[in-house]
Amino acid sequence: MSNSTALFQRARQVIPGGVNSPVRAFKGVGGTPVFIQKAAGAYITDTDGKQYIDYVGSWGPMVLGHNHPAIIDAVLKAVPNGLSFGAPTEGEITLAELVCRLIPSIELVRMVSSGTEATMSAIRLARGYTKRDKIIKFEGCYHGHSDSLLVKAGSGALTLGQPSSPGVPEDFAKHTLTCTYNDLNSVKCAFERYPQDIACLIIEPVAGNMNCVPPKPGFLQGVRELCDQYGALLIIDEVMTGFRVALGGAQAYYGVTPDLTALGKIIGGGMPVGAFGGKREIMEYIAPTGPVYQAGTLSGNPIAMAAGLACLTELSKPGNEQQLAEKTQQLAEGLKTLAKKHGVPFIAQYVGGMFGLFFTDVPEVTNFQDVMKCDVAKFNRFFHLMLEQGVYLAPSAFEAGFMSLAHSDADIEQTLKAADNAFAVLA
């Protein structure tokens, strides 16, 4: 019995499902999850001592690679001063100043401890600011596990939301309208039906929770125009895309300006940090300057602020943004070439430092329904074939992959060699 198997059995005795976040259980791909002992650069090492090239990167934060010296040094320097104060520190100001410089649409920013807190708080703020209740989200887009966002579409854009998780009251979920990603007409119809009721529209600018689905040209701009037309706030959820698709986020890459932005993952450099920010007028509606309440015991934690500042400072260095995108392109295009070589129906979609792998014979995946038509069983086989060869991909056909600056040309070539073998088996 492997150490991972033994640990998983032990974990299930005291942790629901043996994990602290569901996707880690390998339920989507089958088998026993890999338990990690340590990580450095582009590599993770499991509890049996096997090393893997990692394309999960803690689900996005490790854009510099694991255990980056600049981040570790910043954390070690901060720790002797104390772990938490529950009071303001200079570090949170410095990180906020950097975030506002990198993302110009953010004039004021509030630190929290997770991406879920960021999106949840941004939506509460939007509702309070507009004095409206309904929100729009998109089928297949995930914005954390707050109640109003755990809703998936019924048949058609105008169907009132139904809870997609037990424990979410239908009376609460009915305020969430679900539209089709990359379909402006579905958004227009929702606004036309509830012209005075929609507080905000929240969107992943690149849908990374149905693998990796970029927006069609003009889609984000069209959403922006509809929000303006009907007086709703546009919230761009950059928890995954922020600082990864581009240094200024996907909003900079695609040229669209939101009213509010949610951040997470990279902003903490591996520590638990989220943030939401936007126009000064709107952000001043949050307590203590305004009536909308939001608080957090560990918000602005000094150790987490030090890690986040070190990460963004390093990532901001000239050439890093382009280098990250080039590495991602090298991997994705290489995979497409190998799949074609072996006659395996497959496409790879990518933007900046994130990518998605789809086993399908269509040339492009543009929404959740397209994703659901992909061959999940074939992805699962591919995942395990790669895992056996020391390549750790996201253990789900519905999750994006993440490149880091630590991945070398040799790492990518080794990954492609493993993929060549895997595609040969799948052919």
Curated annotation (Swiss-Prot):
It holds the Pfam family Aminotran_3. GO terms for molecular function: glutamate-1-semialdehyde 2,1-aminomutase activity; pyridoxal phosphate binding; transaminase activity. GO terms for cellular component: cytoplasm. Homodimer. It is an enzyme of class 5 (isomerase). One of its GO terms (biological process) is protoporphyrinogen IX biosynthetic process. CDD domains: OAT_like (cd00610). Its EC number is 5.4.3.8. The keyword Cytoplasm applies. InterPro entries: 4pyrrol_synth_GluAld_NH2Trfase, Aminotrans_3, Aminotrans_3_PPA_site, PyrdxlP-dep_Trfase, PyrdxlP-dep_Trfase_major, PyrdxlP-dep_Trfase_small. Belongs to the class-III pyridoxal-phosphate-dependent aminotransferase family. HemL subfamily. Its main location: cytoplasm. Pathway: Porphyrin-containing compound metabolism; protoporphyrin-IX biosynthesis; 5-aminolevulinate from L-glutamyl-tRNA(Glu): step 2/2. The modification N6-(pyridoxal phosphate)lysine is found at residue 265. Keywords: Cytoplasm, Isomerase, Porphyrin biosynthesis, Pyridoxal phosphate. This is Glutamate-1-semialdehyde 2,1-aminomutase. Its cofactor is pyridoxal 5'-phosphate.
